[in-house]
From Swiss-Prot:
Disulfide topology: none
The protein's name in its UniProt record: Cation/H(+) antiporter 5
Pfam families, sorted: CHX17_2nd, CHX17_C, Na_H_Exchanger
Record membrane topology: Multi-pass membrane protein
Transmembrane segments: 71-91, 136-156, 163-183, 198-217, 230-250, 265-285, 298-318, 351-371, 388-408, 417-437, 450-470
Keyword Signal: no
Tissue distribution of the protein: Preferentially expressed in pollen.
Biological role: May operate as a cation/H(+) antiporter.
Family note: Belongs to the monovalent cation:proton antiporter 2 (CPA2) transporter (TC 2.A.37) family. CHX (TC 2.A.37.4) subfamily.
One annotated GO biological process: proton transmembrane transport
Highest taxon above the source species: Eukaryota
GO-annotated molecular function: antiporter activity
Organism of provenance: Arabidopsis thaliana (Mouse-ear cress)
Broad class of where this protein is predominantly found: membrane
Length: 815
């Protein structure tokens, strides 16, 4: 017994016990034995550890949790530094590219001396658990699952023939061209790339990964344009074509037993997803009460299935990310399930965990070897030369064969080239595949160094080129005057009405019914229901037939459909069309621009972002995102815009009040003239009594002069001249002039008449720069309403009358 104890203590001496106590592991004196504490030490013993044992005590990042936190902070700060720096100098490099740059920047730190702190943090010894790398792998699986959830497979059914031809050509034809070149390269002595490496590089350069392209379009903010929709549809077709080519290659090049196993495995997995998992998800949605979240247990089951799919495809030797991606495709998009998954996990995964994966992936780049290969390029020799030959051939072929179908479809040359650039861009999808190739021993680390560098170059340069070649804002510039002033009397009046929430429906219907001559057949009304995009990757635009919606049907626009269907049923003479747009609030203005241009609308009505209770004393909803959407519309709308603030108890649209009192406040300027032009249109409704209140400052400083003053006078005279509709001795227009000294007088005057009118119409820029609003502008809370409009909706103002703030069309381009 004593001899055994002596042997034990001889093998494990005092040094070992010091290591074991603090490190959680230790080596015997001769280095032949290793002992580890289970479970491992996660946290340190505190700040006194190094003072207690200065030799044996660990550094704080030697423990798992502090080490993980150190790496997360380092990676976060580094990629944010690159992202913000590049953005500051005008280079719109995507966030994912910045994460890759951060990893590439520190990839050579493994060449530093071992006693450097950065070495201990980024390249720990093999005895320590790789917690950051493990979480990065977790993010890798999660990324593919979330991308599948956000993808709308239904878009494939809506693609046209030209899009399908472009998507197939941009994958198949570059592969054919590259095979021809590679054959010639082999004949002239190419010897560095193996056949499997060549096929892997060729395939990944030829495909157009939908998930990567969709993220690029989001980063460049062009996924909401018509051009963006075409590119997304083309990428979906190209991605499907690439998947088919991959399956064909597996059957042709691999052992038939392996191919059979993979074929049976993937078919069985798809059948299980479509016929078992997806119906189960619909069963979960059916059991979930409307407007309520899905139970957490179902969310966890789906996550387990995602990781199970990953490991299943890994076992049958297929790209494992396809497993969680296919599961994501099976998740019904939108609320409650799809949107809840995206809201719950995407931000954390993309912002915290995914940078770890990209960072550690790029750490594998061998910089010195790559520099040596670059030097060999002048001799037209080396592995880099062979790989670059394939990359350039496929890239050029992909650009050409992507542009030709687009040009034949009469797409502008610049747009065709930009689309080809987008389809040729490489990013996280390709990086994931090459990394999987290294882990599967299909690619050597040297080949991964080349391809990771090429992906980094592509994902850095392509977005910058696309940003400067394609200006999406130009797509929304009108070449004609689309405002009410330029509209001839008797011409068709085209409204575009925006609805954000169900609370806006009755207010907009009441405004239309009470204010405008709906009995005439010269009014067209286009209604767009704007729904926040959650749980989807790309916007959805739906054109509805005006048919009666079925109550109880769970639809995005069910309430809107029912309400406006009844509205059209009563006002049969009006032309009415309804649309639903599911979009990111930051880009909703682009959807509104597109529809306004397409329908040649003259006036666009937006609901105010604040909703009050019925007694007008409490704010029920204050949606900042909707406010930002309104502000974006005002900046570049292709027609005149009105922001409607509903502040009164609603009247029935079918039983109009005998008279509807409207006050048009006029100071001067183009917005006020547009407000008067709107008043002229309202005069065609026999139930409208219009009062034009002209505010004249005691001092004329800042007032319009010259041509603007003539236009102001002409518009007032036009309103009075058209006052020909009378019933007996009743006049429909009353013209009142009031002189005010300052903003205080204006406020007092408007307070005195607040309860006399049902609707106030005012220009957004009314009184700006004059004594009419002096001192009031300092208290303006909502810039989109202007100074007087903001006063009319303030807390101190009586809340009987609604307010319509008008802005005339801002931008008219010259051909």
């Amino acid at each position: 017994m004593e001899s055994r104890n002596e042997a034990y203590e001889g093998a494990y001496n005092a040094t070992f016990w010091g290591d074991f106590s603090y490190h959680g592991y230790g080596f015997s004196e001769d280095g032949s034995k290793f002992c580890e504490q289970i479970p491992i030490l996660v946290n340190s013993f505190g700040v006194w550890e190094k003072l207690d044992l200065p030799i044996r005590g660990m550094k704080i990042w030697d423990y798992s949790l502090p080490h993980l936190e150190s790496v997360i902070v380092l990676v976060l700060c580094l990629w944010q530094f690159f992202y913000l720096s590049l953005k500051k100098i005008g280079l719109p490099v995507p966030k994912i590219t910045s994460m890759m740059i951060a990893g590439a920047a520190l990839s050579q730190t493994n060449l530093l001396p071992n006693d450097w702190t950065i070495q201990h943090i980024l390249f720990p010894d093999d005895t320590r658990p790789k917690v950051p790398e493990t979480l990065g792998g977790f993010a890798f699986v999660f990324y593919w699952f979330i991308e599948g959830v956000k993808m709308d497979v239904g878009m494939v059914r809506k693609t046209g023939t030209k899009v399908i031809v472009t998507g197939i050509a941009t994958v198949i034809l570059p592969i054919i061209a590259a095979n021809m070149v590679f054959g010639k390269l082999r004949e002239t002595g190419g010897k560095y790339l193996t056949g499997m490496e060549y096929r892997t590089i060729l395939f990944m350069q030829s495909i157009s990964a939908f998930t990567g392209i969709s993220r690029l379009l989001r980063d460049l903010r062009i996924n909401h344009s018509e051009f963006g929709r075409i590119v997304i549809s083309t990428a979906m077709v190209a991605d499907g074509t690439g998947f088919g080519v991959n399956l064909f290659a597996l059957v042709a090049w691999m052992d038939w037993r392996v191919s059979a196993l993979q074929g049976v495995g993937i078919i069985g997995y798809v059948i299980f997803m479509v016929w078992v998992v997806r119906p189960a998800m619909f069963w979960v949605i059916k059991r979930t009460p409307q407007e309520r979240p899905v139970k957490e247990c179902f969310i966890y089951i789906i996550l387990i299935l995602a990781f199970g799919g990953y490991y299943f495809l890994k076992e049958i030797h297929m790209f494992p990310a396809v497993g969680p991606f296919l599961l994501g495709l099976c998740v019904p998009h939108g609320p409650p399930l799809g949107s809840q998954l995206v809201e719950k996990f995407e931000s954390f995964n993309t912002g915290i965990l995914l940078p770890l994966f990209l960072f550690f992936s790029m750490l594998q780049i061998d910089g010195p070897w790559l520099a040596n290969q670059i030097g060999q390029l002048r001799h037209f020799d080396g592995q880099l030369y062979e790989a670059l030959t394939i990359i350039i051939v496929v890239f050029v072929a992909k650009i050409i064969f992507s542009m030709i179908p687009a040009l034949l479809a009469k797409m502008p040359l610049t747009d065709s080239f930009v689309m080809a650039l987008i389809l040729s861009n490489k990013g996280i999808v390709e990086l994931c595949y090459f990394l999987y190739g290294v882990e599967s021993n299909v690619l050597h680390v040297k080949s991964f160094t080349i391809m990771a560098t090429m992906i980094l170059v592509s994902s850095t340069i392509s977005p910058v080129l696309i940003h400067y070649l394609y200006d999406s804002s130009k797509r929304f510039i009108s070449f004609q005057k689309r405002n009410l002033m330029s509209l001839k009397l008797g011409s068709e009046l085209k409204f575009l009405v925006c609805i954000h929430k169900a609370d806006h429906i009755s207010g907009m219907i009441n405004l239309l019914a009470q204010s405008f001559p709906l009995h005439e057949s010269t009014i067209s009304c286009y209604v767009i229901h704007l729904v926040e995009l959650v749980g989807l990757d790309n916007p959805v635009f739906i054109s509805h037939q005006m048919q009666k919606a079925e109550p109880g049907n769970r639809s995005y626009s069910n309430n809107v459909l029912i309400a406006f269907d009844n509205f059209k049923h009563y006002w049969k003479s009006i032309s009415l069309e309804l649309f639903t747009c599911i979009s990111n609030p930051r880009y909703m203005h682009q959807e509104i621009y597109s529809l306004a241009l397409d329908k040649q609308a003259s006036f666009l009505m937006l609901p105010f972002h604040i909703i009050w209770s019925l007694d007008q004393t409490t704010v029920v909803s204050d949606d900042v995102m909707r406010r930002n959407a309104n502000l974006n519309v005002l900046r570049q709308a292709p027609c005149s815009v009105g922001i409607f603030v509903h502040r009164q108890k609603l009247l029935s649209a079918q039983k109009s009040s005998p008279s509807f009192e409207v006050c048009a406040i006029f100071v001067g300027g183009k917005d006020d003239r547009e407000a008067l032009a709107l008043g002229r249109q309202m005069m065609r409704n026999p139930n409208v009594n219009l009062t034009v209140l002209k505010l004249i400052p005691a001092k004329m400083d800042g007032m319009t002069t010259g041509w603007d003053q003539m236009l102001d006078s002409a518009e007032v005279k036009e309103v009075l001249r058209n006052n020909n509709n009378t019933v007996g001795q009743h006049s429909f227009v009353e013209y009142v002039e009031e002189t005010v000294n300052d903003g205080s007088d204006t406020s007092t005057l408007l307070l005195s008449i607040a309860n006399s009118f049902d609707l106030f119409v005012v220009g957004r820029s009314a009184g700006v720069g004059t004594d009419v609003v002096s001192a009031l502008s300092e208290w303006t809370e909502f810039d989109e309403l202007g100074v007087i409009g903001d006063l009319l909706v303030s807390q101190d103002f009586p809340r009987r009358g609604s307010v319509l703030v008008v802005q005339q069309q801002q931008n008219v381009a010259c051909r």
